[in-house]
């Protein structure tokens, strides 16, 4: 089933050069290309070449590499396209807006504050932060992740 999904994946087809893409960066592990929608001028996607459905599945080493490329490309986009800033984001699952199920990160150059709306609704009066904190805090796991990250970024 997973193999079938990958054969239908538009990003895998771009990686395999089965369909064209405006590729702005490529190495052994990842690729970056212009998003056809161009939500903003220069809208770029960065993807790992290995198929992962979303950020929850990607291994830490691949994620670290992809993020380094995102940072470098975002800087290049700001400089070369005279963007005033960028949004860097990923969507995970349909409820969050994911439409292509191959992990990817959007680099959205920003020129004018009105060209794209990304808004956060304030629910602070409806949420018990202590309750949420207790549910997601895991000190031991965070310590292990920190040690692993220190090794990754050396």
Kindly label every feature range from the protein language model.
Residues 1-154:
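HIT superfamily nucleotide-processing domains
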């Amino acid at each position: 089933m997973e193999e079938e999904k990958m054969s239908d994946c538009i990003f895998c087809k771009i990686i395999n050069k089965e369909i064209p893409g405006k590729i702005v960066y490529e190495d052994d592990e990842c690729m970056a290309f212009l998003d056809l929608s161009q939500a903003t001028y220069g809208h770029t996607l960065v993807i790992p070449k290995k198929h992962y459905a979303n950020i929850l599945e990607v291994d830490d080493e691949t994620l670290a590499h992809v993020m380094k490329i995102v940072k470098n490309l975002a800087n290049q986009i700001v400089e070369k396209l005279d963007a005033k800033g960028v949004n860097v984001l990923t969507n995970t699952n349909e409820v969050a807006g994911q439409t292509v199920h191959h992990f990817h990160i959007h680099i959205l150059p920003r020129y004018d504050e009105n060209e794209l709306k990304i808004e956060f609704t304030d629910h602070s009066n409806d949420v018990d932060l202590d309750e949420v904190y207790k549910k997601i805090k895991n000190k031991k796991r965070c310590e292990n992740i920190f040690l692993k990250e220190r090794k990754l970024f050396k």
